[in-house]
């Protein structure tokens, strides 16, 4: 039942976060991982797994929060184009740190544990009740913020208004809460946050972001549900969700 719950949460959180990023930057290549959040989650998970100083979920959240704080400060000082460039470079740097941590794994068991998280699956191995409650709170806050700012983002995307840098930074923080609710538990699932929002914009020509929230959430949940059922009922073992999306 918890696995199905996180299929639903991931199917909503990642596409909605992707739609928000595309509207915030007015760019169809906008993605929840474009500012290095995915790389930061992987670095935090790797550090937590290899050191044992906290749970994998908490480590992932803390590192993603630090990354968001850095992006928050940068957002206050640069324009959109410069921020995207910074995000790509910053994400590459964080990813390199994660690689260094992983290649120095103390033993094979820890390396396997990290890999299974990084490959993304809904088995929720090693996830505690506290992790679940924490992620549900993040999801509720992030989704509420997405709905609250829907009209403002639509006007911003249409060029009717221009958000201040502070407003953009606060939106980034809200998107981080939404995305981390999924990534910290299930691992990074990249295709859902980029491909699904673009498919939604092909299907629906309206610029009302609320319609794309609905369409993207339905498509994302449906796609992840199919891949989860394939992984559960076909003897593939633990199969990465990001790969299952293409396999299915």
Regions found by a protein language model. Give the residues of each.
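Alpha-helical transmembrane segments in inner-membrane proteins
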Residues: 1-248
